[in-house]
Amino acid sequence: MPRSVHSPFLFEAAWEVANKVGGIYTVIKTKVPVTVREYGDRLCLIGPLSYKSAPVEVEAEEPGPGPFGDALRSMQDRGVKLLYGRWLIEGAPRVLLFDTGSCYDRMDEWKGDLWNLAGIPSPPNDHETNETIVFGYMVAWFLGEFAARETDNAIVAHFHEWQAGLAIPLCRKRHIDVTTIFTTHATLLGRYLCAGSVDFYNNLQYFDVDHEAGKRGIYHRYCIERSSAHCADVFTTVSHITAFESEHLLKRKPDGVLPNGLNVVKFAAMHEFQNLHVQSKEKINEFIRGHFYGHYDFDLDNTIYMFTAGRYEFRNKGVDMFIESLARLNHRLKKMGSKTTVVAFIIMPAATNSYTIEALKGQAVTSQLKDCVEQVTNRIGKRIFEHACRYSGEHGTEVPNPEDLLSNEDRVLLKRRVFALKRNSLPPIVTHNMADDANDPILNQLRRVQLFNRPEDRVKVIFHPEFLNSNNPILGLDYEEFVRGCHLGVFPSYYEPFGYTPAECTVMGIPNITTNLSGFGCFMEDLLESPEDYGCYIVDRRGQGVEESVDQLTGQLLSFTTKSRRQRINQRNRTERLSELLDWKSLGLEYAKARQLALRRAYPDSFNDDEPDFTGVQKVGVPLSAPASPRMRTGMMTPGDYATLTEEMEHLSTQDYMGAKSWKGINDDDDENHYPFPLVMKPRKRSDSLASAISGTATPSGGRKLSEKDLARADAALSNAEGVHADGVNGHH
């Protein structure tokens, strides 16, 4: 008897479940609430057990009776150590963590089985691969035990990244009755190739992937990743740019794109997040006063704070382009005679020895000056009060003589504190003593372009080689607080499968700059008619050379710097409105579509055309907004619908199925019109064949252009979709 597809179990496996390592932890953690609302206790997250993080992340429970508990007890009886309980986050999902160390005695047997099964080699000294193999076999073991006991309902297993994906080919080979989805957040080979300064996107189709992986010593890892992608029922990526990359490097065209989202906290009133910006900005101002003591000759009310942040990947994160653009911006501002000062922060962790003496001294002397001024102010206030109390109207004046307010002792104290601010050196460009100062790429480029924080420079630079936290003695802010206090985030990445940093800026109402080689940049560019009107600037790194891209970025920085305060406030309001596009309440629909597509492929007979299709028109409750909400490229779509999993246009590339029903963007920065926010999913009719779904692949430089045959096929497919006209197809490049 076939399994029921109406109440399936969902297992989601990732290396970062209850174990913060990187960005996938954020994806899993923030997505949980919407998934729990759909599945309840039919959802269980699976990951490796970290004895360091598990005690503070998970509340242990005993599994109850039933197929799930029986499967766990069966494994425990055979020596498997595991932790089952509730993840202590919003939604409190069930979580199952396997202790890979408890099965290391089986590792050689499993490595041999993997070689016989798939021809995948496994070097003995690669600890990460060893962990991946053991974890993959343990997950496949559990799924087999559970599927043998739970025979009524369908089972969906969703795997994130190659470290968790090995269970997919094992389930396929063992004929375990589970439906599998594999999501790659970045390809292994892509990261290595981009870090090697190759012209990655223009040569993507020409790489000999086996040779390149072998040359870099990651062939065995690449094989695991590729087998996971090919054996999964549904293969997805997090962005179109990664889909294009996966098609050429993993040799399978993804079935769709599942963009990353965030849990968006909406404020009751528009002014609330503006107030948070002002409060956080004042804390940054305090740091700036200390850092630039002795050369603090600029107006903080006429200062723009920019920043870039992330892992220290000098080229992949576009730090080289950012610094070059800052140097050109500095030249232009000086040439214009501008009074505006730009302070650019670079927040990236690197090897350091300690804080610099100058950075610590600056904060200390300004703090002492502030305390001294407060003491003197209190004494002056007391003298004014005493004078007013003694005034009788017969002699003296109502207001004391200003010279009598400041005593000689106060004058000496103030002079000492002010003289302590004098210094002969320039403000430092880095807050820490670097472990390898002479070879640090960021410092070397700052020296090359001569950004040394000179008094005449309009652009000042501060490199903070450590992630932010509120206990920092120099810049004591958490990352979120710091972002809220800045005016602009700059992330001109060359390789960025999605990019949470610009997304976090958007949710907090901070304008940002990204590129069309980042997943987030592609997402916003394809979704909005004029993203720059809403504070999302996109640098073209796909269709033009480096010099042109640097000039474009410099122009965007200059344009933002010359905005008035009112224009910046209006733009922040619009940027904050974009947060609804990044909310999991909307983007969670894309994961639901992927799961349904997987079930349709595994159990086609369980679906019939008379059933309502959940990919039909679904209105997302978004009110009329003030100020104006973003205008979409098409009036009939959800935030992720341009990447939706459909089956009509299997042969078309991403650009073949972009909606083109344009809305005019806002041109006036001060315009505050009201108009609707049309978030409606495109209605689609099912194809007769369930063999494939749309490929979420983009075609950056080197990709093909649309042929007449492609356009005709797109027209035919869209003409079958209710309410969507055939002239909405766009071969957009």
Curated annotation (Swiss-Prot):
This is Glycogen [starch] synthase. One of its GO terms (biological process) is glycogen biosynthetic process. UDP-alpha-D-glucose binds at residues 185, 191, 311, 496, 499. The gene is GSY1. The lineage of its organism: Eukaryota, Fungi, Dikarya, Basidiomycota, Agaricomycotina. It holds the Pfam family Glycogen_syn. Pathway: Glycan biosynthesis; glycogen biosynthesis. Residues 689-700 have a biased composition (Polar residues). It is an enzyme of class 2 (transferase). It comes from the Eukaryota. PANTHER family: GLYCOGEN [STARCH] SYNTHASE, GLYCOGEN SYNTHASE. One of its GO terms (cellular component) is glycogen granule. Its EC number is 2.4.1.11. Disruption phenotype: Disrupts production of intracellular glycogen.
